[in-house]
Design a protein with these regions (language model features):
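Short active-site segment of divalent metal-dependent hydrolases/proteases
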Residues: 25-26, 59, 135, 175
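Conserved acidic residues
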Residues: 16, 125-127, 166
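Residue-level marker for buried hydrophobic side chains located in beta-strands
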Residues: 18-20, 53, 129, 169
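Short acidic, glycine-rich surface-loop motifs adjacent to enzyme active sites
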Residues: 20-25, 118-140
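Active-site glycine-centered loops adjacent to acidic/histidine catalytic or metal-binding residues
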Residues: 22-23, 56-57, 132, 171-172
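N-terminal active-site segment of His-dependent metallophosphoesterases
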Residues: 1-31
Length: 179
């Protein structure tokens, strides 16, 4: 509806990509939701720009999520599309899986390695990190995750050390907050 209202149904020329921090559908195991609630409404947009989602608790290990998205396969070998990174111009986009069963040292060690490589990469000036569960939320305190706090701490330390800003995107609360 936003594109129809703001841009007469057209995709703006300066829209380079779409990032979605999880909860793409209500029930990830239901095919009709992917078609009717996700792909059909966004068909015009998704046909013109790349889409980089991370998995939320509503998609949790849905075979449809992994079937419909071809995400970078540069995460840990056993979970390569659960966490990943993609370079887009001078931005490194990092996708993390903050669902409970993937809150582990393997993912945090992988992030350490990616941030070390990013520090050395002179072509990368910014990091956009997206994950589903927020560390802090003014909208839903029960949805906060300490694990995400560990990720945010690593990203903030990276930015302080390198001067390369990291911007963090979260889902789960289904709302906007700046807190």
């Amino acid at each position: 509806h936003y594109l129809e209202h703001e841009f007469d149904g057209s995709v703006p020329e300066n829209l380079a990509l779409v990032m979605i921090p999880g909860d793409l559908v209500s029930e990830g195991g239901e095919y009709y939701q992917w078609k009717e609630h996700f792909f059909d409404p966004a068909q015009d947009l998704f046909s013109e720009v790349p889409v980089y989602p991370v998995i939320g608790n509503h998609e949790r290990n849905s075979t449809y999520y992994f079937k419909y998205f071809s995400l970078p396969k540069n995460g840990s070998p056993e979970h390569d599309e659960h966490w990943w990174y993609k370079d887009y111009g001078n931005v490194r986009i990092i996708g993390m899986d903050t669902n409970e069963e993937y809150q582990n040292r393997t993912q945090l060690s992988w992030l350490d390695d990616v941030l070390a490589k990013t520090k050395e990469n002179e072509e990368i000036d910014f990091v956009f990190a997206q994950m589903h569960h927020p560390h802090k939320s003014e909208l839903w305190l029960a949805g906060e995750e300490d694990y995400t706090g560990q990720i945010v701490k690593k990203l903030e330390a990276f930015s302080t050390e390198t001067g390369k800003p990291s911007i963090h995107f979260f889902g789960h609360t289904h709302g906007y907050s700046r807190g």
